[in-house]
Amino acid sequence: MISVQNINKFFGSQQVLSDIYVDFEEGKTNLIIGASGSGKTVLLKAIAGLHNIDSGNIFYDNTDFTALDDKQRIAIHKQMGMLFQGAALFDFATARENVRFPLDFFTDWSLSRKNERVDFCLNRVNLGDIGDKYPSELSGGMQKRVGIARAIVMNPRYLFCDEPNSGLDPQTAIVIDRLISELTHEYKMTTIINTHDMNSVMAIGEKVVFLYQGKKEWEGSKRTILQSSDKALNDFVFASEMARLLKEPKF
């Protein structure tokens, strides 16, 4: 479990996270939702150690991540998989080389052992035949799946996904959602996903946290979202649904 306890984050004089307290459940898909500027990406990056916080604590099980020095944090970083917005693949590297990067950085495995693990992960995301292709030769959905293969190559305990469906068509987004959900349960990972897509929430969300203006406004299950009386949450759900309808093809 990952426990966030009363964290605060400022950029200059602007407070972007205010007294956030939430537990993210082990072995489940935990979704952070909110409008642009609500603080969800900052929160995700703070949990992953990519942003320092100004106060509060972040616990990985019983370990206070915020109290560790950089060297001590490496042990936890090795247990993290990250899927960045846009997949963030290296253009100069093949799909296989992109997936292998964490193994090159964190392990002293032989090249044959690394490639065996890489090929296993590419096959797991149904891309076993594209290892020698470059990102420019792949569709957006295929790039996202390469990113997912890279995220799981270290057999992580924690998976962080920043807007995994950004830029994808609805059908491809469904495929990515299902794949992330399957891998979460297969690897028993604590998965945290940032999204503004209510389709993703209703499809795979097991715990949902709603941020509003840098604060935790609401948390619960996807089944209770539509029963909530929280005005900010209801406004967000309505706006998300309107945006979805406007994107649908007109006949």
Q: Can you describe what each PLM-predicted range is?
A:
Residues 56-64:
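Conserved ABC transporter NBD signature motif
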Residues 153-157:
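A short, proline-enriched helix->beta-strand linker immediately N-terminal to the Walker B motif
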Residues 170-172:
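Helix N-cap at the start of a conserved alpha-helix in ABC-type nucleotide-binding domains
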Residues 48:
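Helix-to-loop junction immediately C-terminal to a conserved catalytic motif
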Residues 111-129:
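Conserved ABC ATPase "signature" region
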Residues 134-138, 142:
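Conserved ABC ATPase signature
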